[in-house]
Every structure is written in C-alpha cells, then in structure tokens.
C-alpha cells in the first residue's frame, strides 16, 4: 500500500471538509473556484449578458460555467487551459500551454477581427511550495495574460487575474495601472486563508 504523505493527507482532509467544495457539488459547479468569481461578480458586476469573454486557466470549468450562464446565448466565451476540459455548451475551448506562441495564436484566431469585453484568468503554475520558484512562474503567466488582454480588449474593457504577492508584484501592478482607468484588489472569502492568492481587477482599458 502506498503511504500518503502527511501534507497530502492534510490536503485531502481540508478539501473534503471544505464547505465550498460541498456547495459546488450541490450546485453542480465543477470546482470551488466558481464561488470566487461569483463573489467578485456580486461586488463588481463584471459580467453582463451578451459580452465577449476570454477565460484563461479554465479547467475544470468552474469560471466558464459561471461566465457562460451570465453572458447568455448572445454572448461569446473562449476558454483555454493546458489540461482537458469537458465541453460546455456554446464555449469555444482551446487546449494547450499558454506559454507557447502556437496556443496564443489559436486564441487570437478564435477572437478574429473583433475585440472582447473581458479577460479573466485563474491561471497558476504547478506549485513546488518554494516561493522563490513559484512566484516568478506565476508572475510570468500574469505577464502573458496582460499581454493578451492588451491585444484583444475593447477600449473600456476589463481584466481580472489571479496573482500572488511577492517579487515582481509591485512592478506588475504599476504596469496594469498604466493600462486601466481603475485597479483594485479582491480577496474572495472562498479563497483559502492560508493562500497567497489575490485577484487583481483592472476596469476601463485605455486602449492599445
């Protein structure tokens, strides 16, 4: 029999005792992450019917489920992740590593000549538990997401991204502030207390 590590056993115990995990199962959401977006939506009203949205780091689909329901049949949602994701009606899914140019090009092709209203990203690298390694990896993904957002957002569009406090955060925040009229931080109650994650919200894209 394989012996579970203490940290693995603790994670499993926390996961199955997590009220948001239980609520997600009850509500039919694919992950507890749905409640993070729902809480931000309740406060900021980011997502509206008929919007065009890109969802990065989408698998298993918790944010895409919420977004698809809110934008309705007249909206458009392009989702992407390195992992597979079970299909969601009317959602265009692009599987691949977002750090590869080929995947970026596929997303840009899906957007086409039009622009989008909102880019959301719940991307995170595989965490090693060593901040000196994990934070730079996470910031690299944030930089790539911001680069995409500046290419595809309409003037006045919005940007929501998961970010971790650490080296490079202040420079990144300054960069986002230069591109958006208003920038705020969000820490949903459904985000675990011990997690360093926060969500950075940029409203009112100034244009490329």
Swiss-Prot record:
Cite a GO CC annotation: cytoplasm
Q: Which SUPFAM superfamilies match?
A: S-adenosyl-L-methionine-dependent methyltransferases
Which keywords label this protein?
Cytoplasm, Methyltransferase, rRNA processing, S-adenosyl-L-methionine, Transferase
Q: Which residues does the record give as S-adenosyl-L-methionine binding sites? A: 61, 63, 81, 97, 122
Cross-referenced InterPro entries, in alphabetical order?
A: RNA_methyltr_RlmE, RNA_MeTrfase_FtsJ_dom, rRNA-MeTfrase_E, SAM-dependent_MTases_sf
Question: What reaction does this catalyse?
Answer: uridine(2552) in 23S rRNA + S-adenosyl-L-methionine = 2'-O-methyluridine(2552) in 23S rRNA + S-adenosyl-L-homocysteine + H(+)
Q: Active-site residues? A: 162
Q: What class of enzyme is it?
A: transferase
Name where it's found. Answer: Cytoplasm
GO MF annotation list? rRNA (uridine-2'-O-)-methyltransferase activity
The EC code for this enzyme is 2.1.1.166
Which spans of this chain does the record mark as coiled coil? none
What function is annotated for this protein? Specifically methylates the uridine in position 2552 of 23S rRNA at the 2'-O position of the ribose in the fully assembled 50S ribosomal subunit.
Family the UniProt entry places it in = Belongs to the class I-like SAM-binding methyltransferase superfamily. RNA methyltransferase RlmE family.
State the protein's name: Ribosomal RNA large subunit methyltransferase E
Gene field: rlmE
